Amino acid sequence: ILGKVNLSEWAYYFCQDCPLGYSALGGQTLNPYGRKIFETGGSSSGSGVAVAANYSVAAIGSETSGSILSPSGKNSVVGLKPTIGSISRNGMIPISSSLDTAGPMAKSVMDTAILMNALVGFDSNDEYSYNSEPVFYQGLDTVTLEGKSFGIFKKYEKDSLVKISLDLMRKAGAKIISFKAPEIELQNFIKLLDIDMKNDLPKYIKKSTNKKLPFDSINDIVNFNKMDSLLHAPYGQENFTRLVNVNISQNQFRKTKCEMMKLAKSYFKVIKNLNLDA
């Protein structure tokens, strides 16, 4: 381990309209391809920047929804959000135990696969953890995609970089099938994150932090930040303030989670109907 990096504070679930890559502790992370010209992406901002700037061969990020993929795209590196449970989340600051995971980021698919290989494994301290075989870089030395079918949303086909990638895949033997993205409204997505973080963060504080810290709950954190908002929360803390008032029963939570899973599975129907590998 070479070191830690500066990330978007509280996994970018702390404030509204605040810049990606900012934390009160580390300040503003900058994109090495254009400081203050291009965004860093987030929330794993420093992980993407560190790899792009050659500070490290690879880095680890965490993702609930987009926090590995976003900074990977913004910094031109390869990022992977693994299946939840394949990598232990023990010790990770949570947004959502339903959706959180750690994941690898590197400059190439091979390096990302090698790091993924090193990260997977069962951990009894993570209730979602399962034993996954570390075989992620096997077969990457071959260039053929013969017999494989890949789907692409029609709206992305006109992007010049996507076109280049699709042409390379076709040359390697892949079949590319374009389709219109399903129209899915994830109305309860923020509600799910709110419920999970309201429940999961106090558990993390109790289990994994210094016992001398002056807070045990999200409300304590909000009040602590108010003591010096210019230092601790210069862009506000709207999300955390909202979380203080979240009060939903376990039955409502389970119903919300089931609804989200049902909507997500609509994408699997498309994959099955078009006979796609990915």
Regions found by a protein language model. Name each.
Residues 1-102, 127:
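Short glycine/serine-rich loop/turn segments
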Residues 1-2, 54-58, 108, 148, ...:
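Loop/turn elements at helix/coil->beta-strand transitions in domains of secreted/extracellular proteins
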Residues 4, 56, 119, 161-162, ...:
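Glycine-rich, small-residue loops and helix-cap segments
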Residues 16-23, 187-200:
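Charged, often glycine-rich, active-site loop that binds/positions anionic groups
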Residues 52, 117-124, 170-174, 194, ...:
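Sec-exported extracytoplasmic/periplasmic mature domains
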Residues 81-165:
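A short helix-breaking turn/cap at a secondary-structure junction
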Residues 144-151, 195-263:
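Short helix-loop capping/hinge segments that flank enzyme active sites or metal/cofactor-binding pockets
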Residues 175-189:
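Short connector loops at secondary-structure junctions
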